[in-house]
Amino acid sequence: MSADHDHDHDHDHDHKPAPMVEEVSDFEILEMAVRELAIEKGLFSAEDHRVWKDYVHTLGPLPAARLVAKAWLDPEYKKLCIEDGVEASKAVGVNWVTSPPTQFGTPSDYCNLRVLADSPTLKHVVVCTLCSCYPRPILGQSPEWYRSPNYRRRLVRWPRQVLAEFGLQLPSEVQIRVADSNQKTRYIVMPVRPEGTDGWTEDQLAEIVTRDCLIGVAVPKPGITVNAKRPVLKANRPVHHDH
């Protein structure tokens, strides 16, 4: 699924932070209700849920960052990542079947992982328009803004504008391709290796591959090793659009 739309629309140019998340997702409310019902019906216990929750909160983006760093250094491994993301994940310690406490994954997490390789003329960015599908075993918990209806609705319609709000201004000749995650397929982005990193080790490279880079709303830069504190700001140079 791809989108690359530029339209005309007047925007306020004040530069105050504009938090994207001001809504409670209906799916979060639904999750709590379904979870309580499942425990009541004996499908799993509250202890099972606690163990799973503890496991999920140990996850982070480091395995995905290492996957990208390794691919930057090894063309054959990069090829494997693009062809079979699930198999490539094993090299960074993630087995999508046996890593979760259940030892058989879950319908939510055991699925096809696709690694989307950027190029100088193509930028990928990931969203889940239906709910909040996210490759947790390799990327950890999704950020709150990723789950917000605001991000999910707008990215598909105005990807260039939304990326600009994240501070990522892309030249007009760069195509933006939006990948829509779903129950069966999850995505991570393999950004272009930045200039100024020649001779870097895998560990050094992995440090600059942040979670936001792996979702596609940022690009790696030497010296930048953390996500922006406020993920969404008003763009300094907004991309105008019509409705």
Swiss-Prot record:
Family in the record: Belongs to the nitrile hydratase subunit alpha family.
Name of the featured protein: Thiocyanate hydrolase subunit gamma
Subunit-structure text: Heterododecamer consisting of 4 alpha, 4 beta, and 4 gamma subunits.
Cofactors (names): Co(3+)
Pathway: Organosulfur degradation; thiocyanate degradation
Job description of the protein: Involved in the degradation of thiocyanate.
Top EC class, one word: hydrolase
Cofactor note: Binds 1 Co(3+) ion per subunit.
One GO MF term: transition metal ion binding
Alphabetical keyword list: Cobalt, Hydrolase, Metal-binding, Oxidation
Cross-referenced SUPFAM superfamilies: Nitrile hydratase alpha chain
Residues where Cysteine sulfinic acid (-SO2H) is found: C131
Positions carrying Cysteine sulfenic acid (-SOH): C133
InterPro entries per the UniProt record, alphabetical: CN_Hdrase_a/SCN_Hdrase_g_sf (IPR036648), CN_Hdrtase_a/SCN_Hdrlase_g (IPR004232), CN_Hdrtase_asu/SCN_Hdrlase_gsu (IPR023900), Thiocyan_Hydrolase_gsu (IPR023901)
Keyword Metal-binding listed: yes
Enzyme Commission numbers on file: 3.5.5.8
GO biological process, one term: thiocyanate catabolic process
Organism encoding this protein: Thiobacillus thioparus
Catalysed reactions listed for this entry: thiocyanate + H2O + 2 H(+) = carbonyl sulfide + NH4(+)
Positions with a binding annotation for Co(3+): C128, C131, S132, C133
